[in-house]
Regions:
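Non-catalytic interaction/Regulatory regions outside core domains
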Residues: 1-116
Length: 116
């Protein structure tokens, strides 16, 4: 599968980790309920591997993730991609509270919350 396969289904958080044990993976895993509630799929590029809350990351998907993170490297290490496929924010560090606030202010998310 490819990054495009998530469009209109999931919001994506892509993280270029500072190191293999930089804490980003644990931060994301500890917020599982909030992440699942917002239809978020996350990927952390540790340099040697891509870790995700998905079962498996194919070679083509890993290539897509690394390419997008490489293109945005000068703008930030953390990308939020909306369900429409557009980049919604680029940050220098992973701040889940800020990401959740940004998502919760998006029109599509507001409609989802009303429907629940």
């Amino acid at each position: 599968n490819r990054l495009d396969d998530y469009q209109w289904k999931n919001r994506l958080i892509l993280v270029q980790a500072a190191s293999e044990n930089g804490g980003e993976i644990e931060t994301l895993r500890s917020a599982r309920a909030e992440i699942d509630d917002r239809d978020i799929v996350w990927f952390v590029n540790t340099g040697s591997d891509v870790v995700s809350n998905q079962k498996a990351v194919s070679g083509s998907l890993e290539s897509d993730i690394k390419a997008v993170l490489d293109e945005s490297r000068s703008y930030g290490r953390v990308l939020l991609i909306g369900k429409d496929g557009g980049i919604k924010s680029r940050e220098s560090s992973l701040d889940l509270d800020a990401i959740f606030r940004r998502i919760d202010g998006m029109p599509m998310r507001i409609r989802e919350m009303r429907a629940d």
